[in-house]
Amino acid sequence: MEVMSHLVHWVFLAVYMYELNAELISHLHPPEQEISTDSCVFPFVYADGFHYSCISLHSDYDWCSLDFQFQGRWRYCTAQDPPKCIFPFQFKQKLIKKCTKEGYILNRSWCSLTENYNQDGKWKQCSPNNF
């Protein structure tokens, strides 16, 4: 009977150590997070607002939605994610077909993020490559 009692204790110890080892392995080697390669959608709707570029709302890092109406699908932004300029776009009484310095007091080129800047007021500064 005493041998059986020792055997039961050893079995419990072995099971406990196995579970502890499995838990330790899962902490040391967590499953890798899948990184989405889906494109950001601009504009997207989140928190009752339209967003025309990556945002850091509720996050430490910029992110974007993968759907027009945010449905929980998102990814962190990269340098390749800024929204694209929309050409042509309406500015004042003109139809602008490329980045322009008109109306920018810092004399830098800019573009609209929508077809009608007059209506939406969404813009970004152009990069040296004008995108």
From Swiss-Prot:
What CDD domains does the record tag this protein with?
FN2
Q: In which tissues is it expressed?
A: Epididymis.
Q: Which GO terms describe its cellular component?
A: extracellular region
SUPFAM superfamilies found in the cross-reference section = Kringle-like
InterPro entries for the chain: FN_type2_dom, FN_type2_sf, Kringle-like, SP_Capacitation_Regulator
Disulphide bridges in this chain?
C40-C64, C54-C77, C85-C111, C99-C126
What Pfam families does this protein map onto?
A: fn2 (PF00040)
Annotated source species: Mus musculus
Where's it found, cell-wise?
Secreted
Q: Which UniProt keywords apply?
A: Disulfide bond, Repeat, Secreted, Signal
According to UniProt, the name of this protein is Binder of sperm protein homolog 2
Q: State the source organism's domain of life.
A: Eukaryota
